[in-house]
Amino acid sequence: MVLMMDIKIMSAFSILFLSLMVSNEFLEFLANTVYAAILFIIILFFYQNRQHFFTTSSSSKDSLTSTTTTTTTTSITSSLIQQQQEKEQQQQLEQQQQQQSIKLITKEITIENDSEKNTSTTTSIITKEQSPGSVRLIQNYSASQQSELTNTTIKQLQQKNQELQEQINNQIEKSRKDQLKYFNSNNKSQSEIKEQIEKIIKLTEKNDDLLNSIVILNSTIDGNRIKMQEITKDRDSIYSSEQKLLSRLTAFEKKEKEYQDNEKQLQKKLSDQKDQYSTLKKEFDEKVKKSNKLENSIQSLESQIQKLLQKQEKEKQKLEKDKERERSSSFSSDISSSSTTSTTASTFLSSSPSKSIPIPIPIKTSNAISDLKRNNSNDSVNGLIGNGNSSVSPPSSSYLRESSDDSDNQSSSSPSEPKFKSLFNKVKSESSKIVNKAQKGINKHLGSDFFTPANTTTSTTTTTSTTSTSTTTPITSASATAAAISSSSIITSPTTNTTNDILSSSSSSSSSSSSLLTTNAILSPPVGNEQQMEVINDKTEVNQSPVKPLIFFDDLGNDKLLDSTTEEQIQSKMTISPRDKDRILIDKEQSLSDLFINSKENISNISVSNLDNFLKTNNNNNKNNIEESNNNNNNNNNNNNNNNNNNNNNNNNNKNDNKEVNSKLEFSIKDEENKIGLRRAKKKLSPGCSTMMEDVSIAIYPFLKEKKLSNCSNIGLFGVFDGHAGRGAADSASKLFPKEIEKLLESGNYSLTEQDDGGDNNHNQSKLLNDLFSNVDNKMKDHEYEGCTATLALIWSDGEEQQQQQQRYLQVGNVGDSSAFLCRGNESIELTFDHKANDPSEKQRIKDQGIPVSDNQTRINGVAVSRSLGNHFIKEQNIGMISTPHISNRYLLTPQDKFVIIASDGLWDVINGKDAIEKVSSLYDQGATADSMASCLLETAIQSSLCKDNVTVIIVKL
């Protein structure tokens, strides 16, 4: 471990040293230290030999030499000090100057030596002893030659020498200080170097740890990649399921839209039905008022009849009293009188109030109710009267009186009966006529089977009224009088004890179609000592067989006309077909039974099936009428179209003969952000964008008119660009395409005209569009995460514009799913191919490139298209997205070619190309403008619930 640490320290130190050696600052530092060392050596040299250079016995000449040497040393020291602060270039110059100064000094010394040799009278011997670091100059002067001048000069020189020594001492101190600073800085640098070495050691340890962690991270990254692949597979499966759910959702939204449309139609029809109902209600109310008036008149007649019957009964009682008197007077024959009294007692009871016996009331009934129930009891008078617990026996045949028996007594009432009968029959016939008219009117408006004959007998409502009266008071009712009019015999009805027997007897009697009112008057036996009589009027409603109960329209203003059961029944019958040209819409209408549920009366006799059948028959009749009118219109249109086609054929023949085509183009662009659809799709703003409108379009006509290209004119350039992840890429593409195609056409390497040498001009134009798309995509490298689809249409004419005979051509290139269609005659020609990631051919292309693709994959890195401009981040990953366009054939335009539709996928998600061509061609035949045609397609897209994207439409009329 120690060796490893030493090796690491040495390696770190060597690396640091090499790095310092390489740096320019370190080289300058080394140069400065070398110069400082040289200067220090020179100063030490002169300092050690100062006694030899500076002596008092030296001559002036020697002093001059010493001064020169000192000056040279001072200059050298000063120059060296300055050299430490300058750079390498200045140091080289100073070295050259030093060398030159040394040469000059040596020259001066030689010159002085020559002068001394010439001037000296006495010989002076200069000896040089070379010793390490010292030079001795021995001068021998003669004492005789010293003079005062020399002494003065020597003094001056000594002073100068002292000054120079002081300067040298100062410089030496400065150099010492500099050395101290250098020493301190060197120590600091060494300490820093040690710290750096320690840091390097720590960093190496950390580096080892990082290497280990990198290895671990690489292994984790590999695992994460595997997991990522699995997650992508799961994501693709989830996205496929999401697409399925979205398709279902779109289907449901289609159904919802159709349901809403049907609901609007139903509301309109319901409002019409309400208007009809209101008119019918008014008519019905008027007829009800008339019937009420008739009933009032009938009641008044019944009251008059009741009075007449009361008078008749009084007369009958008088006649009976007279007969009793006659019978009592005839006492001659006792046997006959006893038999007659017994029979009269059995037929007519005594009217004395002391006996408390009820008097049977003579009641006229119809022949239809002559068969009454009879109880097996005695025919005695006690059986008729009985007590409260005994049952009353029915009357025998002796109780019945024929009309011939009382012909003399009823002479007063017989003439009045036919009058009332005829009057009542008139009232009945008039009321039946009114009711029948009402039924016919309602059946005329609502259907022939609305009022159906009742299968069962009408239910009778019984009302009981108990009155305690005396036996002498005659008890009758209005209904009894009405029955008496239509009857021809008088019977006495038996009495019962309980109300249940009364109800059972009343319910057993059925009403015939001829009789309107029937009644049974029933007498109750006495209770206690007082005589009480209970009268129950069983009054049957006026109700003929085809008549239903009264219908009340009071709740027509309410919105809630359906209860839950009927609404479920109607919804179960509703079927909504998918979006199709030949779809059958079943209108959901509220039946009349639904309108009558909240009414005040019970309308159980009205069946829902009858009403549904009625509505269906009406709808079928309306549909048949509409179909007949449409067929007539279609026949007329077909005739007009045939005439137009004949004219067009003639014109086409003429145009084909002349080979002339209208060179002017009419076009229109319509676009919409479609915020509702985007909100429906839950889309949000892209980061950095202020709008959600990502569609951009161009329409340039005439294009390059000023350039005057050879053999080419009337060029039109039309394009739609649908951006994703923002509209930046679409904006760039819309600006780059016109510039790039202009460059390519001006280069001379591409041509749009026919070739006479047998070349393939279609291939030439395909090469033009391929290079155009590739150049634009290469200039969109900065759009890494943004992209767009592109659909570009070129329309041009061959030859110059002044030529009369010109042929026009059309060619389209696209990437993505913005489509274009050509309308030729009444047919649609698709000019583009949708490059979607879920397309089988695109999946096969990606597989052929060696890229794995799952069957459920519908997107490439979240993008729905497999070819686009931009998206260079995805393209660099090489996962299947390219920018190679689909190029259509070159189409020679003929007079049958009407227009071209270019639109983004927001339109094609709602309507297919064939339906769009059919929708717009009808407007084209009517002479509509391109603007109105584009507006029509835009509105159909935006109003659909399937539209969840921006919509851009270009119409080019050819």
From Swiss-Prot:
Listed CDD domains: PP2Cc
Gene Ontology molecular function: metal ion binding; protein serine/threonine phosphatase activity
Record's compositionally biased regions (Low complexity): 329-361, 390-401, 452-475, 491-515, 619-655
GO biological process, one term: signal transduction
E.C. no: 3.1.3.16
Binding-site list for Mn(2+) 2: 722, 905, 949
Key words, A-Z: Coiled coil, Hydrolase, Magnesium, Manganese, Membrane, Metal-binding, Protein phosphatase, Transmembrane, Transmembrane helix
Organism listed in the record: Dictyostelium discoideum (Social amoeba)
Entry's cofactor comment: Binds 2 magnesium or manganese ions per subunit.
Residue numbers spanned by region Disordered: 312-361, 380-421, 445-475, 491-525, 619-659
Name of the featured protein: Probable protein phosphatase DDB_G0282105
Ranges of compositional bias, category Basic and acidic residues: 312-328
Subcellular location: Membrane
Coiled coil: 142-330, 613-666
Listed GO CC annotations: membrane
First-listed, main subcellular location of the protein, grouped into a coarse class: membrane
Keyword Hydrolase: yes
Upper taxonomic lineage: Eukaryota, Amoebozoa, Evosea, Eumycetozoa, Dictyostelia
PROSITE patterns: PPM_1, PPM_2
Binding site for Mn(2+) 1: 722-723
